[in-house]
Each structure stands twice: as C-alpha cells, then as structure tokens.
C-alpha cells in the first residue's frame, strides 16, 4: 500500500459503501451491455499476504479481518439493492496457515475461519450476510512440503470448516519459486515431474482438505 498504513486496506473509511456500489454497478453494467452474468464475485484478493505492499507487483490488497468484513457487507448491500443474484466468495487467503492461525502477520489478519464464521466475532462475523457463500476460499501455496505437513494442515482445514458447517474451495495454484523439489517456477516446465507435483497438490486439497472446487 502507498497509504502509509502497511497491512491495512487501501480504502478510505468513508469509501466502503462507494466500493460496494462500484462493484454492483460494474456487474450490472456488464450483464446489461455484454450479456455476461457473474455467478460469483471475490472483492479482495489475498488480504493476508506477507509480501512487500509498497510496490505495484502484487495483484492483491492487504486488509485486516475487520476491514474485509466491512467490504463484504457493503458489497452484499449493493448486490441486494441492485437485485443481482451474484454471490460473494471470501476470502482468497494467500496461505492456509492464515486460515487457522497467524503467519507473518498479527491476529488482525489471521484465524480467518473462526473470525468470519464465529457468531461471537461481532465485528467480523459474516455467516448471516446476504448472498455470501457459506464457504471459504484459499490458495494452495507455501504449505506443500514436506509431504506429511502437506497432509496435516489440510486435515486441520477440513476439521475447522466442518466445525463451522462451511465448505472449502481451493481457488488458485501455480508453481512458485520456493518449490525447490521441482526447481522453482521459472522458466516454463512441461515435464511429467512438474505435472505429477501439481497433481499431488490438487490430490491433497481434494482428499484431505475436502476442497469442493
């Protein structure tokens, strides 16, 4: 972020409603003009990322759980007002560890499953938000080695989601530079070694985390 508030959302306090209205207006305009209907909208990407937010190289935005919840509620209001049936997907976590606890950030950007789906979390609870899917989405990075840990953390996600009666979607995966087992993510590698590595990650997400997407 270039706001001088590292780790927080790049929105002014009085702009949450405007942001929700912008998303709804854009979705409605695209549908009316181009005939394209969006089944789902994810308003923020990787809010818990632990990278350097001062530059333009990351397609996400930092946000605390409270900020994310506020955005989701405003988007919900705008969708309802515009009579759109698009559903909201949260929260595109960059790291499975942030869903269960904290990782390279404080409590404000961690414990996401509990934060968004525990009724006692009065400032972040989203379980009753209109048109918000009863599930949580995340990206399958940084937790793929060693293999026993790969399975362990996904089993924990499965159990945590089961306790909150929500589903889990794995919504993004690619070969990152830290995947030393296959030599990193560049340049392009179309070998069977990489294919089997990716298949193993997907297998673990489906079987052990019970990912439905």
Tell where the protein language model's regions lie, with residue ranges.
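Receiver (REC) domain switch/active-site residues of two-component response regulators
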Residues: 39, 134, 212
């Amino acid at each position: 972020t270039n706001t001088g508030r590292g780790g927080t959302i790049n929105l002014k306090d009085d702009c949450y409603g405007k942001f929700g209205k912008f998303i709804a207006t854009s979705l409605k305009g695209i549908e009316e003009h181009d005939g394209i209907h969006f089944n789902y909208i994810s308003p923020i990407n990787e809010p818990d990322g632990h990278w350097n937010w001062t530059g333009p190289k990351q397609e996400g935005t930092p946000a605390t759980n409270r900020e994310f919840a506020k955005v989701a509620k405003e988007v919900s209001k705008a969708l309802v007002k515009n009579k759109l049936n698009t559903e909201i997907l949260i929260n595109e976590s960059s790291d499975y560890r942030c869903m269960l606890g904290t990782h390279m950030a404080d409590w404000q950007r961690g414990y996401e499953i509990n934060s968004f789906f525990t009724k006692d979390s009065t400032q972040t609870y989203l379980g009753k938000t209109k048109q918000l899917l009863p599930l949580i989405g995340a990206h399958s990075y940084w937790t793929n080695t060693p293999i026993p840990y790969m399975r362990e953390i996904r089993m924990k996600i499965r159990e945590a989601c089961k306790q909150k009666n929500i589903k889990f979607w794995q919504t993004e995966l690619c070969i990152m530079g830290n995947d030393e087992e296959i030599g990193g993510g560049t340049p392009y590698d179309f070998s069977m070694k990489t294919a089997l590595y990716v298949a193993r990650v997907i297998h673990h997400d489906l079987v052990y985390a019970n990912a439905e997407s």
